Amino acid sequence: RFLQKLVLPDGTVFNCSVISFLYGKAVGELKGERLIAKMRDIGEMTAKLHLQSINRDNSVRLERPHWDCESFFGENAVWGHWQDYSLLTESDRMLFSKCEALIKQKLAHYGKARDRYGIIHADMHFFNIITDGEKDQLIDFDDCGWGYYLYDLGCSLVTYSAALPELTAAWLEGYEKIRKLSDGDKKMLPLFLLLRRIVRLAWLSSHADSDTAKTVGADYLEATKELGEKFLAENKVD
């Protein structure tokens, strides 16, 4: 029963393997106060995951991809280039180019110390977390690799613009029950929220035929632009 053949309506066949069945529903189905409350739990879970990375035996070689500026914005960026997203105007490209430059600069200053950069999930959005009301379980580790710990927050909130401050505060409250962040770390939270949204534009472009890309439209872009404008207004390029 753990090996199944899945046939899609168009005749495409997938051979699927199952390790175990997880009962519950995706956190992404929760709304309002229930979602904010669950965000505290997700913050705790994320911190526990990061502590596993921080305390791991570095003598054990772990070959996983890196999620850094080269992977996000480089010539061979993993998901392609945000500039190729079809809905962008020239004004949008100018805005996000400024954001990219500032993100690169600030990440260079932030650095990759062991308490800031290590093994992360790298795709911890709410439909990759299954909850039965008491127990939360994380799935889909194919993107797991080396990256900035706070990038996992950006992944969790990549599709949310409403109640973003409340969700971020709830995540931080849960996270710091397990692992304290420095003031320098906390100042970087808006950067990682914006970073993931910009990188997702590249994914939407390179996966334009996917169901997800077809359902994401102007609202996502507008919310990303608002975050970008706020980020630039509150920071400056040296």
Each model region followed by its residue ranges:
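ATP-binding pocket architecture of kinase catalytic cores
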Residues: 1-58
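Active-site catalytic-loop/activation-segment of kinase and kinase-like phosphoryl-transfer enzymes
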Residues: 17, 63-109
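A glycine-centered beta->alpha junction motif in the catalytic cores
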Residues: 18-30, 78-87, 198-214
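All-alpha amphipathic helical-bundle segments outside canonical DNA-binding/catalytic cores
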Residues: 37, 183-193
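Active-site acidic catalytic loop and adjacent metal/ATP-binding pocket
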Residues: 101-150
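ATP/Mg2+ or Mg2+-diphosphate-binding catalytic cores
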Residues: 200-238
